[in-house]
C-alpha cells in the first residue's frame, strides 16, 4: 500500500501531521512491536514465500486486517526460518501465491514432463545386470577344482599335525624325564603321520607316561604357597592406601580471602592424637600441591564453594576484644576495690583507723553499684552483638 492510499484511508491523520515528517511514516511491527518507518506491508505482492502463510505457520494466527506491517529484520528472520524448514524437510523452495510465480512453476513442471529423460535410464541399468549373468554360465574345467582343494586340505592338515607334534614332543619328553621308572606300567605310544601316506613316513614316534597324580599335588602346593604370604602382603599394603584429608580450600579461594583481608590457618591437632597416630599427625597444608581425590560424593555447582570448618578463620573486626562473663566481672570488681583502698590509705595515713574504714566504706558503695551497672550494660551489649553471629564449630573470630 503506497503513501497516497494511506493518506486517502486516513485523511484526518494526513491533515494533522505533515506529509514529509518521519513520525507519520513510522509503523508498528506485527512481530517485535518496534516503531519504525522501515516497514513492509505483509499483503504486498512479492516474489518468494507468502509472508501471511509464514506468520500463520510460525505464530499460529492469521492477520485479517490489511494494515499490518513488518520491520526489515523480522521479515528477513521469517524468510530465513522458512528456508531452514525447507532444507530440513528436503523440500525445494516454497511456492508463493502470486500469479507470476505460480505460472512459472506450472511451466517448469510441464517442461519436465515433456523431457524424454526417463527413456535412457533403463538401458543403463540393464547392461551391468547382463554381464554377471553370463559369468556363471561359462563352464570352467571341473577337474582341477578338487585337486587344488585337496592340496589345500593336505597342507592345512600337515600344518596342524606339525603343531600337534611339537606339543606332544614337549609334553612327552618332560613326562619321560620326570617318571622313568613307570614306563612299563603306564606307557603310551604316539605315532603321527599325514593323512593319505604310508606308515613308514611317520612324523614322530614318542613313548611317554601320563602323570595323573602329579598335577593335583602341584595345585595343592601352589595354593598353600599363595595362602601363606597373604597376611604379609596385607600388612605391607595398608599404609599405601592411607588417604590424607583433602585441602579444605582451593588456592584461588585463599588468594581471594587474602585480598579481602582474611587469613586462613589450620588448627594444630591435639597432642594425644599426634602421639597415637604419628603418621597422621602431619596434615597437608591448605595450598597443598598434592591433588588427591575429593572426599565428597556430590559434584559441586559452578557457584558453590566448599568450606570445611576444621580450620580457623581469623578476621579483623572493630568490636570488643573478648567476651564478657560473670566470673570475669567479679574478678574485675574485686581488683578495682583493692586499688581504691590502697590509694585511700596512702592519702589518709595520718588519720585514725576507724576514720579510714568509715571513709573507705562510704564511697565504695555508690562506685561499686555504678561500676556494676556499667559492667552489666557492657556485657549485655556484647552479648547482643555476638548473639546475631551463628558460627559453626571450628570457626573462631579474633576480635581486635
Curated annotation (Swiss-Prot):
Subunit and interaction comment: Component of some E3 complex at least composed of sina, ebi and phyl, required for the degradation of ttk.
Residue ranges, annotated region (Interaction with sina): 109-127
Name of this chain's protein: Protein phyllopod
Cellular component per GO, a single term: nucleus
Coiled coil spans: 319-362
Gene: phyl
InterPro entries: Znf_AD (IPR012934)
Domain of life according to the entry: Eukaryota
Function: Essential adapter component of E3 ubiquitin ligase complexes; involved in R7 photoreceptor cell differentiation, embryonic nervous system, external sensory organ development and specification of particular muscles. E3 ubiquitin ligase complexes mediate ubiquitination and subsequent proteasomal degradation of target proteins. Required for specification of R7 photoreceptor cell fate in the eye by participating in the ubiquitination and subsequent proteasomal degradation of Tramtrack (ttk), a general inhibitor of photoreceptor differentiation.
Tissue specificity annotation: In embryos, it is ubiquitously present before cellularization. During stages 9-11, it is expressed in neuroblasts and the SOP cells. From stage 12 onward, it decreases, but remains in a subset of PNS cells at stages 12-14. Weakly expressed in wing imaginal disks, in the SOP cells of wing margin bristles, notal macrochaetes, and other sensory organs. In leg disks, it is expressed in the precursors of the femoral chordotonal organs, as well as in external sensory SOP cells.
GO MF terms held by the record: ubiquitin-like ligase-substrate adaptor activity; zinc ion binding
Keywords: Cell cycle, Coiled coil, Notch signaling pathway, Nucleus, Sensory transduction, Ubl conjugation pathway, Vision
Skewed-composition ranges (Low complexity): 127-138
GO BP field: enteroendocrine cell differentiation; epidermal growth factor receptor signaling pathway; negative regulation of canonical Wnt signaling pathway; negative regulation of Notch signaling pathway; Notch signaling pathway; positive regulation of proteasomal ubiquitin-dependent protein catabolic process; proteasomal protein catabolic process; proteasome-mediated ubiquitin-dependent protein catabolic process
Region annotation Disordered: where it falls in the sequence: 125-145, 346-382
Induction of expression: Activated by the Ras1/MAPK pathway in R1, R6 and R7 cells in the eye. Down-regulated by the Notch pathway.
Interaction with ttk, as annotated region: 241-320
Intracellular or extracellular location(s): Nucleus
Amino acid at each position: 500500500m503506497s503513501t497516497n492510499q494511506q493518506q486517502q484511508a486516513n485523511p484526518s491523520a494526513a491533515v494533522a501531521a505533515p506529509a514529509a515528517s518521519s513520525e507519520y511514516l513510522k509503523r508498528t511491527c506485527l512481530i517485535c512491536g518496534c516503531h519504525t518507518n522501515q516497514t513492509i506491508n505483509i499483503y504486498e505482492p512479492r516474489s518468494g514465500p507468502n509472508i501471511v502463510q509464514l506468520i500463520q505457520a510460525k505464530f499460529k494466527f492469521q492477520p485479517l486486517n490489511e494494515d499490518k506491517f513488518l520491520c526489515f529484520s523480522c521479515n528477513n528472520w521469517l524468510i530465513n526460518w522458512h528456508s531452514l524448514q525447507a532444507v530440513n524437510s528436503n523440500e525445494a523452495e516454497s511456492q508463493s501465491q502470486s500469479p507470476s510465480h505460480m505460472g512459472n512453476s506450472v511451466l517448469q513442471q510441464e517442461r519436465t514432463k515433456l523431457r524424454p529423460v526417463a527413456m535412457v535410464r533403463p538401458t543403463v541399468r540393464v547392461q551391468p545386470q547382463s554381464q554377471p549373468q553370463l559369468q556363471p554360465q561359462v563352464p570352467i574345467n571341473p577337474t582341477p577344482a578338487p585337486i587344488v582343494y585337496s592340496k589345500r586340505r593336505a597342507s592345512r592338515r600337515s600344518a596342524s599335525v606339525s603343531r600337534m607334534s611339537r606339543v606332544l614332543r614337549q609334553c612327552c619328553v618332560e613326562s619321560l624325564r620326570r617318571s622313568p621308572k613307570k614306563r612299563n606300567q603306564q606307557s603310551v605310544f604316539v605315532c603321527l603321520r599325514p593323512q593319505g601316506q604310508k606308515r613308514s613316513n611317520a612324523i614322530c614316534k614318542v613313548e611317554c607316561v601320563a602323570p595323573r597324580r602329579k598335577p593335583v599335588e602341584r595345585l595343592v602346593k601352589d595354593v598353600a604357597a599363595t595362602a601363606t604370604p597373604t597376611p604379609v602382603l596385607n600388612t605391607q599394603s595398608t599404609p599405601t592406601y592411607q588417604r590424607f584429608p583433602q585441602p579444605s580450600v582451593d588456592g584461588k579461594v585463599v588468594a581471594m580471602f587474602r585480598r579481602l583481608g582474611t587469613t586462613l590457618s589450620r588448627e594444630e591437632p591435639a597432642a594425644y592424637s599426634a602421639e597415637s597416630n604419628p603418621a597422621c599427625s602431619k596434615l597437608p597444608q591448605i595450598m597443598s600441591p598434592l591433588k588427591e581425590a575429593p572426599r565428597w560424593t556430590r559434584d559441586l555447582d559452578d557457584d558453590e564453594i566448599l568450606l570445611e570448618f576444621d580450620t580457623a578463620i581469623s578476621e579483623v573486626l572493630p568490636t570488643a576484644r573478648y567476651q564478657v562473663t560473670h566470673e570475669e566481672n567479679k574478678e574485675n570488681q574485686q581488683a578495682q576495690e583493692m586499688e581504691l583502698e590502697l590509694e585511700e590509705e596512702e592519702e589518709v595515713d595520718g588519720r585514725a583507723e576507724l576514720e579510714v574504714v568509715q571513709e573507705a566504706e562510704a564511697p565504695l558503695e555508690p562506685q561499686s553499684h555504678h561500676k556494676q551497672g556499667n559492667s552489666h550494660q557492657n556485657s549485655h551489649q556484647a552479648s547482643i552483638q555476638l548473639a546475631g553471629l551463628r558460627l559453626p564449630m571450628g570457626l573462631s573470630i579474633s576480635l581486635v
